[in-house]
């Protein structure tokens, strides 16, 4: 509104309609009234800005509590080198030819020895590593070892016979034992087990104590 009022004041039509007599006297005489008139919308703008700033802070606080927007799974590079291993991983299961197999990848800061989930020891290369395994549990076992002993983050995938790659873990980019804002708890009750109702109270109701 203030900008629209100023635009009408300085429009050519308003200037042409004004009387061209004693311009300097009129300007000097009306200066105090213009100053007092401008002081009112200034306070109004200040209150609007203060309200907008408060709304901005509230919106920022809400955004921090919400879940992070979108997670893009890392793409699998089939050209990643495998660790140096002289033994055998037991080979892929026969179902890998008709169903799927699993691939775990990680990046090592240096060349170091690690224990294979299938037995034996291997040397992980400095930089990216890729290892094919027959079972998902083997990937989880190796990944747990990488994180606990070597402080290395990992991810693994499921590869189908058609060549399709499915990203599996960590699903939302954060490992399950870590807190992730916005992650929904499954079967979560914010109470101790001692505060559950007595099982006899829900007997024959089709419910469980943790449902109430």
Curated annotation (Swiss-Prot):
Q: Which SUPFAM superfamilies match?
A: Photosystem I subunit PsaD
Q: According to its record, how does it sit in the membrane?
A: Peripheral membrane protein
Which Gene3D superfamilies does the record associate with it? Photosystem I PsaD, reaction center subunit II (3.30.1470.10)
Keyword annotations of the record: Chloroplast, Membrane, Photosynthesis, Photosystem I, Plastid, Thylakoid, Transit peptide
Q: Which GO terms describe its cellular component?
A: chloroplast thylakoid membrane; photosystem I reaction center
Q: Where is this region: Disordered?
A: 53-80
Could you point out where the transit peptide sits in the sequence? 1-50
Subcellular location, in the record's words? Plastid, Chloroplast thylakoid membrane
Say yes or no: keyword Protease present: no
Q: Where is this region: Ferredoxin and ferredoxin-oxidoreductase binding?
A: 145-153
Tagged with keyword Iron:
no
Task: Give the compositionally biased regions (Low complexity).
Answer: 53-62
User: Its Gene Ontology biological processes?
Assistant: photosynthesis
The UniProt induction remark is:
By light.
What is its biological role? Answer: PsaD can form complexes with ferredoxin and ferredoxin-oxidoreductase in photosystem I (PS I) reaction center. PSAD may encode the ferredoxin-docking protein.
Task: Give the UniProt family note.
Answer: Belongs to the PsaD family.
Record protein name field: Photosystem I reaction center subunit II, chloroplastic
Q: Organism source for this protein?
A: Spinacia oleracea (Spinach)
UniProt lists the gene as: psaD
């Amino acid at each position: 509104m203030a900008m629209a009022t100023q635009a009408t004041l300085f429009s050519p039509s308003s200037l042409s309609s004004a009387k061209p007599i004693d311009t300097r006297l009129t300007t000097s005489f009306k200066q105090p009234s213009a100053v007092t008139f401008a002081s009112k919308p200034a306070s109004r703008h200040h209150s609007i800005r203060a309200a907008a700033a408060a709304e901005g802070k509230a919106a920022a606080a809400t955004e921090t509590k919400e879940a992070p927007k979108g997670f893009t799974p890392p793409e699998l590079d089939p050209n990643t080198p495998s660790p140096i291993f002289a033994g055998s991983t037991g080979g892929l299961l026969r179902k890998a030819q008709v169903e799927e197999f699993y691939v775990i990848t990680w990046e090592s800061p240096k060349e170091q020895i690690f224990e294979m989930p299938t037995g034996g020891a291997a040397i992980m290369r400095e930089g990216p590593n890729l290892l094919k395994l027959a079972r998902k549990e083997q990937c989880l076992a190796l990944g747990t070892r990488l994180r606990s002993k070597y402080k290395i983050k990992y991810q693994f995938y499921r590869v189908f016979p058609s060549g399709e790659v499915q990203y599996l873990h960590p699903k939302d980019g954060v490992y399950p034992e870590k807190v992730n804002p916005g992650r929904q708890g499954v079967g979560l009750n914010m109470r101790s087990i001692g505060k559950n109702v007595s099982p006899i109270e829900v007997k024959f109701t089709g419910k469980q104590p943790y449902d109430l």
